[in-house]
């Protein structure tokens, strides 16, 4: 049992391998997430390898703890060779340690990504030699069908127990080396039961697949529907993205995306967020295209297309999927070594030996009831068929496969679940029993093995979907709904929703040139007047596994002029209902629901404004009290938004300098399949000390927060402009062409702001995680150590599961920006005096001016007090004033910079004029010389 002193150790001590949890020693870290770390461990006596998932309880809110306990309860009841088993669960005062099966080949996403390097790994060398991957394609079809059979076996088992996984994706499909390779290895792997590491489908010579991560799984009978938004966006079913009621068929969509990625090497739909993802799915209209380089059979393509249907009614049913020809038939193209040499009697099929009261798998599929043809049974038969076994009493924890009692015992260690005490969460002190949010299935109440309901008919499903198109849900149920987006149980943050909602609305209505084009008045409900919440770096955001590369900047022109992917034709507001439910949960009020048009566009568009909370009128839009024409108001709005976007881009570029020092490259994933052991991994941050990482993280974080603040102000102004435009308050004397130009101009900036906002939000979360981890590694007496934190912090947003971020006193974005502007101005002044690199001087002066304007920028116009750091703006202004020596304030500094910029531009103009005169004189001289050499025509004397 882990004591309190073990739980309070830092992550650095965890990596040392000196800790122990129960009967297991903790080794090196093999995985990491926002709330948990995964370590390689060994049993103290048997030396069998395990995976230890250590979850820090302080980082979890109530809902996340319920998800964790739900995962534990589900894993306690599941025993299947193709589902990752839970060996033990040990809870201390600050951590929950899940002892799970160790899958040393990593997950399927890494397997697909490194498919060209599989020949270099000992565990996959033979497979890559027999079934190589084609260039510009995915895995070999034999490997695809092998994994499909094993995944189908796991899903069929879950289906028999009325479970829906809800997060099937390559990252949750873990791989073990093949059984022959494991038998040759000296390092054993702990097995949950005597046959948990023996596959029951597929080929014995290929890696073994196991389904993992049941944090989003729940009991869902075949007649029930769920409405929780959870899972991973790239693999979410469209009905989940639309926030509609869904059933277990959502897992079949995810299976289709996994099959497509295995076949092509990439997901079928790629997007930055779930709104764009749903837009692409709807635009495809169920037309799934495969690259020409992909060489798979038409049967496999047809199966993938039948799974990737937008409508659950049209999607392949579970019964048809389990009995599909691709799943049950012989795998084509096998090498001679992988073809079974003999066929066993159907009565000896071990898959009919389930020892639980739940519906057996043998009664659910014709391929398991003895009606298989010899060709179908050739490959679908389990590798266990060569090991006949007798029935054995299973444990109460779940179903067990029977095995011959006199079979030799394997050398690997056995799970604690094999003992008579069963699996429970061991606590250091006596506490009340925990309550899992997922109701446990009463297996004893199941009468007979044929209890499983047949699949609902097409007519019944259509009738049910119509009845539930607008189901009555109480306010309490809405408030309790999850809004989770990645595998780390991420809650959608309020400002994140607002920014994307407004950008989608503008993109969808870009052609709205005049308010008169709108048909009918806009029905508005009451919404709270106020500013959005703070957008800080302490926000839980989806962690991206991809490299966050940024393009170098050679100029200080408006970077939002780049090409944007805003398509008015295909733009749609996919999560309108999700926005309403999230607003009720996160904001405290509800935005108006959407009214579906008679044609029923899917998804419906947002209404004109109330989706985005009304901000107070910003300073940039206030005039002198006189009536201003619509053209002037639109122009001022566009100019103000562009200025804020440009200032935020300057601050973002400064933050990127810090970020690239912290994250020079994306996390390398070459080690697991590159032939290296986890113990051989080196720390990629050895080039920076812990103090340097803390300093860089703090500076990058406050700069990212400042950039987010400017971007949020730009969206506030765009929101106010759009609300007036939608109500028809402006544009009375504006031509249609001019109005369209202004709308397109502002829409382009808004789309750029949305893209940059999401990017900065993601990077700020990465920096925040690095900062908190680095602070834990500091000495205990260091001022920045968590035990010595003061009150200066960036407060986390309401409802965020993350802790506060503590900053060193005196760190502020304004001070950093002022120092940077001063440094750039001095360097530019030296070049100006020497008349060197005047173009660089201009860029430096422009950047310095915009940074100073960002320093002067305040949040008074937006009405958002929470957008300020807890240290206060006044203290930061005083710090800037102290740096300048009290001689000039920030306004005077900006004025001086503008004067210097004007002087530089004047010099550049003079140099350009002098160069043009020199070129003109040179061209005239060349023309005269060439004229002397040109033959002249002889005058004609014919007339004389």
Swiss-Prot record:
The record, for InterPro entries, names: Atg1-like, ATG1-like_MIT2, Atg1-like_tMIT, Kinase-like_dom_sf, Prot_kinase_dom, Protein_kinase_ATP_BS, Ser/Thr_kinase_AS
Q: Where is the composition biased (Basic and acidic residues)?
A: 865-881
Q: Which residues form a coiled coil?
A: none
Q: Which GO terms describe its cellular component?
A: autophagosome; cytosol; phagophore assembly site membrane
Enzyme Commission number: 2.7.11.1
Q: What happens when the gene is disrupted?
A: Blocks autophagy. Significantly decreases the radial growth of colonies under nutrient-rich conditions. Strongly reduces conidiation and completely fails to form any perithecia. Causes only mild infection in point-inoculated spikelets of flowering wheat heads and impairs the spreading to nearby spikelets.
Q: Which PROSITE patterns match?
A: PROTEIN_KINASE_ATP, PROTEIN_KINASE_DOM, PROTEIN_KINASE_ST
Q: What is the catalytic activity of this protein?
A: L-seryl-[protein] + ATP = O-phospho-L-seryl-[protein] + ADP + H(+); L-threonyl-[protein] + ATP = O-phospho-L-threonyl-[protein] + ADP + H(+)
Q: Region Disordered: start and end of each range? A: 344-423, 443-475, 512-572, 777-801, 860-895, 925-944
List, in alphabetical order, the Gene Ontology terms for molecular function in this entry: ATP binding; protein serine kinase activity; protein serine/threonine kinase activity
The signal peptide here is none
User: A Pfam family in this protein?
Assistant: ATG1-like_MIT1
Stretches with biased composition (Low complexity)? 356-367, 563-572
Q: Keyword annotations for this protein?
A: ATP-binding, Autophagy, Cytoplasm, Kinase, Membrane, Nucleotide-binding, Protein transport, Serine/threonine-protein kinase, Transferase, Transport
**Under which name does UniProt file this protein?**
Serine/threonine-protein kinase ATG1
Organism (species): Gibberella zeae (strain ATCC MYA-4620 / CBS 123657 / FGSC 9075 / NRRL 31084 / PH-1) (Wheat head blight fungus)
